[in-house]
């Protein structure tokens, strides 16, 4: 990460896409996408997804590391080009507990991530706990971040410290997505970004963390990009001009969250304006969902009814029977909720792919289609972009390849935005 940031600060048009997903096909897609380049691949886990208690994935930080390394080994991706990051590391998961207890768990969270070899650490203590006022005083936020940083510094060995980097600040919705519709989004004021940096500098120095300050590479801000279930707010460079100018006077860059579904030109403009770390998550699993839905339509055309996977029906049954991951986010009427379940841009279906019934039905779908020839016309009908790539000779028509390539459509847009020389 340090090299990428240094090159950006030296004037090179260079950024990095942060892949925020625990789905094996998404991770495989990201690693295959850059397999034959010299690029680093940044894969991040969030604190509610992966923590010392297992998170909603059931993985502790060391488990997630081994999970990613296992996929890397399968596809032949070198570990030295992998960067593992931890996002929203702080009291996020324990906001309903008193601050002292939540921070105690947050310290253990940080230690677990750093000990597992995660080198990009987002220190996020911005959320109020059960006995805190709302919002928290910025100095309290910074001092709590310093406590977390101290835990990281004490855990890292000398070799790890060479690669260890920190991200500070937050200007993002609740991790996991917006719970309501959005009409507009507030662009961070440069004075607030400056205050974030100043308070963290004071707090770190109070705690004897002067050296750690040199590892702070980025500040999380809101440049004016967001999405909810049905809408996308696109980047407007002129609205973020002052913010973009301010960071040039520092040794840091910005990190932008919720950049999913922006245009490839917007990604290029964001990197130009020093939002050099672009986080993406739901757009990747949305593309995965589109691919599986498309393959299910092909299955309906090619496989006899009694042999079909019924994957779309199984998804509906599971999500309606177990609505915990979507109920409070989606619209209340049944017809609207079904549209959201299937097609929402926030893609809360992503929480259900590991479910045993859904996983088995997806496996059967792929097995069924592996046993037949996929007609080009059928691929053109349901996956027209992949049909073009087949025609160009850069893709072979297996179900697995079609899914991977569909996910990589998203990554192609980020590469256009982040790469110095693009066609």
Swiss-Prot record:
SUPFAM superfamilies linked to this entry: Aldolase
Cysteines joined through disulfide linkages: none
Top-level taxon in the UniProt lineage: Bacteria
Keywords: Galactitol metabolism
The keyword Nuclease is assigned to this record: no
Record's keyword annotation contains DNA damage: no
GO BP terms, alphabetized: D-tagatose 6-phosphate catabolic process; galactitol metabolic process; phosphoenolpyruvate-dependent sugar phosphotransferase system
InterPro entries for the chain: Aldolase_TIM, GatZ/KbaZ-like, GatZ_KbaZ_carbometab, TagBP_ald_GatZ
GO (cellular component) term, any one: plasma membrane
Pathway linked to the protein: Carbohydrate metabolism; D-tagatose 6-phosphate degradation; D-glyceraldehyde 3-phosphate and glycerone phosphate from D-tagatose 6-phosphate: step 2/2
Role description: Component of the tagatose-1,6-bisphosphate aldolase GatYZ that is required for full activity and stability of the Y subunit. Could have a chaperone-like function for the proper and stable folding of GatY. When expressed alone, GatZ does not show any aldolase activity. Is involved in the catabolism of galactitol.
Summary of subunit composition and partner proteins: Forms a complex with GatY.
Record family assignment: Belongs to the GatZ/KbaZ family. GatZ subfamily.
The protein's name: D-tagatose-1,6-bisphosphate aldolase subunit GatZ
Chain's gene name: gatZ
